Curated annotation (Swiss-Prot):
Single GO MF annotation: oxidoreductase activity, acting on diphenols and related substances as donors, oxygen as acceptor
Cellular-component GO terms for this entry: chloroplast thylakoid membrane; photosystem II
Top EC class for this record: oxidoreductase
PROSITE patterns assigned to the protein according to its UniProt record, in alphabetical order: REACTION_CENTER
Annotated protein name in UniProt: Photosystem II protein D1
Pfam families cross-referenced by the UniProt entry: Photo_RC (PF00124)
Amino acid sequence: MKNTFNTSVFANAYSFWGYVIGFILSTSNRLYIGWFGILMFPLLVLATVAFISAFIFAPPVDIDGIREPVAGALLYGNNIISGAVIPSSNAIGVHFYPVWEALGFDEWLYNGGTYQFVVLHFILGAGAYMGREWEFAFRLGMRPWIFVAFSAPLVAASAVFVVYPIGQGSFSDGMPLGISGTFNFMLVFQAEHNILMHPFHILGVAAVFGGSLFSAMHGSLVTSSLLAETAGDLSLNVGYNFGQEDETYSISAAHGYFGRLIFQYASFNNSRSLHFFLAAWPVIGIWFTALGVSTMAFNLNGLNFNQSIIDSSGHLINSWADIVNRADLGMEVMHERNAHNFPLDLA
C-alpha cells in the first residue's frame, strides 16, 4: 500500500527549530545568547528580581534560629547601607530549602528562604555566564582566557556564599547580601579565623591593590605616549579610527620612560606579555584568596601566622599577633551575643 503519511509537518518543525537554534548560536546578534545563555538569562533575572524584592519588602528573618528575627528590608526601617537580604536561619542549617519545603510562604520568608533562592540562582547564573564567555569566544575563534579571568570573581563568590556556609554547617554563616552585612561578615570571619594572618589572604590583597596599581600605571603610560595624528588644536582621540591597523601609542616610548623611571627590567618590551601579566596577577591572587576562605570554611587554619612568640625561658614576647588575637576575641564575644553561652564558638 502506498504510504500517504504527510511529512510536511516534520519539515516545518525542523525548519522552525533550525531557525531557533541558528538564532541562539548566531554571533551576529546584538546580544549573543548561546547554549549557556539559555540557562544564564532566566537564572540571573530570577536572582535579580528576588534580591530587589527581598531588599525592599522581605519580613525579618530568624537568622540565629533563636526566635529573634533580624530585619533587613527597606520597609522595616533600613537604608541602603544597613539593608540586606538576611541569610537563612541557623535552624535550617545547610539543608536545601525551596519554598515547597516550608509549611507556607510566610514560614519560608521567616526562615530566610529568599537568601538561598538568590544565592543559588546567582551562582549558577554566573557560572553559566562564564560558560557563555567561553562559548562566544569559541564561536569567534578567539583564545579562551576571558572566561579563565572571570573564574576569579566566580570562585570568590562561591567561597563566601556556598563553600563557607557548607563548611560551617549553616547558610546563616554565609555573607549577607548588603553593604553593612558584608562588613559584618568580614569582622566575624576575622574573629573566628584570623584571616588577616593567612598567607593566601595576603596574596589576595597584593592581587587587588597590585592590580589597581598596575592598571593605573598601564593606562597612564599608554595615555601619555599616544601617537599624535591630529593638529594641535584637536583632541588626540580624533586621530583614532576604530579597527585601524596602525598602533595608537608608542610602546617603545612608554618602555623607555618607565625603564628609566624605575629600572630597566621593571618595564615590559612586549605588549602581549605585558597584558598577560595584567590579567594573571589579580586572577591568581584572588584564586588564592578563595582557596584560603574555602579551607577556613572547614576550620583548617594551620597556615596562619598567629602563633605567639615564646623565648627559651617560656616567657611571652608581645607581638602584633597577640594584639590581633585579643581584638579577635573581642569581636567574637560580641557577635551573636544572645545565641552563645560561651565566649567562643564551640566549633
